[in-house]
Amino acid sequence: MAERKVRVRFAPSPTGALHIGGVRTALYNYLFARQHGGDLIFRIEDTDSNRFVPGAEEYILESFKWLGIQFDEGVSFGGEYGPYRQSERREIYKKYVQVLLDNGKAYIAFDTPEELDAKRAEIANFQYDASTRVGMRNSLTLPKEEVEALIADGKQYVVRFKIEPNEDIHVNDLIRGEVVINSSILDDKVLYKSADELPTYHLANIVDDHLMEVSHVIRGEEWLPSAPLHVLLYRAFGWEDTMPAFAHLPLLLKPEGNGKLSKRDGDRLGFPVFPLEWHDPKSGEISSGYRESGYLPEAVINFLALLGWNPGNDQEVMSMDELIRLFDLHRCSKSGAKFDYKKGIWFNHTYIQQKSDKEIAELFVPVLKEHGVEAPFEKVVTVVGMMKDRVSFVKELWEVCSFFFVAPTEYDEKTVKKRWKEDSAKCMTELAEVLAGIEDFSIEGQEKIVMDWIAEKGYHTGNIMNAFRLTLVGEGKGPHMFDISWVLGKEETLARMKRAVEVLK
């Protein structure tokens, strides 16, 4: 038998912003597909029309575009297995619901929500299963004629899966090994509702995966309890031979490790849990995103890849190509992964250092414009090269290097008190004269002449340099002094020195 082609899918519901845990699931599917020369399918699971949120689907697609996770087929991408939106597959699902009814694997139930609530009040831990279905209003207990009459009269119903009692169900998981669950703990899940003529998640999921020839289902651990039901559905349809392999990924946990990561954790600790900023159309609430917070997509990808997986060595920084080469589902953890958001910041810092000065400068130009600064691009590149090792986010560059673009209008009081001596005004006036006479205003050209002048005058080097820095920067920060004066140029350097002497003398 020929080896089966790898086909995996990511199938979100358009119910709001995409959680960062969903991004990791999509990433692992993408890495697995690329490593095996397979296909990644983008499917929209919109069977629950009540939870539909306008703009959510577009948001999800934009998130993956930013992150560089590319789909091969699906909604917005086309393909031979469509339609890829579940709400457009109603007739397909109806056909397979009928297959289960015809072979006795499912039945029709007419119980109203009120009747079910009454049962729950009457019986502790009530579930609709082999022990209780005999006392309910369904096609197993009602005469065939009555069932047909109720349907003809427009009586609303659901189709339930008929779970056989006390049967061991084996789920082979690529991460967790064999998981065995007894069917007695499962209820007769609703597979279809006549009210909206749509299936529930479970039926649509199985039918779509089968018809789209999905080879591996890689999804979050929260779906592990549903896996036995899915195995039974494959068996009921006679699809066991082509049932996909399962891999249930570890949960993303709170930074403290106690419980599942939520948006509240991000709000509490100040980090995003969504890839992009999200404007909730219902509540009006705006939630922060990794892109708008200044994270580089490569850093987010690298950070997420290591939440629940490791390459088997100490390597941490990996490009997408390296991740594709190294990724192995068998190296995924069974236990949850703490969401160490500080590690995400470290990755962003690392990737900023790895990018060229020109690339970071291109990202910094919009920040400068926000502050009303228009500067020659060559100057921006030079400044970035000097200062990027001091920041973890591009927007932080403004905090550490704004003085390169805007002259100080005031001078830090603590620095003035500590660094501006009685003779500083006189010394800076003399230094300005020395600098004015320098023809070669390069870093080396300035340094040699100024240091010779200091030695000749017998001045204290630290006092001169501290005062010089204060005149150009306005405080005691910044790189090497002659780097600053070289970038500013002779004219701007002398103008700043003159103004500082006038203000501070």
UniProtKB/Swiss-Prot annotation:
Keywords: Aminoacyl-tRNA synthetase, ATP-binding, Cytoplasm, Ligase, Nucleotide-binding, Protein biosynthesis
Compartment(s): Cytoplasm
Motif ('KMSKS' region): 260-264
EC number: 6.1.1.17
Binding site for ATP: K263
Motif ('HIGH' region): 12-22
Pfam families: Anticodon_2 (PF19269), tRNA-synt_1c (PF00749)
Major subcellular site: cytoplasm
GO BP annotation list: glutamyl-tRNA aminoacylation
Keyword match Aminoacyl-tRNA synthetase: yes
GO cellular component: cytosol
Catalytic activity annotation: tRNA(Glu) + L-glutamate + ATP = L-glutamyl-tRNA(Glu) + AMP + diphosphate
Keyword Cytoplasm among record annotations: yes
GO molecular function: ATP binding; glutamate-tRNA ligase activity; tRNA binding; zinc ion binding
Record's function text: Catalyzes the attachment of glutamate to tRNA(Glu) in a two-step reaction: glutamate is first activated by ATP to form Glu-AMP and then transferred to the acceptor end of tRNA(Glu).
Family to which this protein belongs: Belongs to the class-I aminoacyl-tRNA synthetase family. Glutamate--tRNA ligase type 1 subfamily.
Subunit structure: Monomer.
Protein name: Glutamate--tRNA ligase
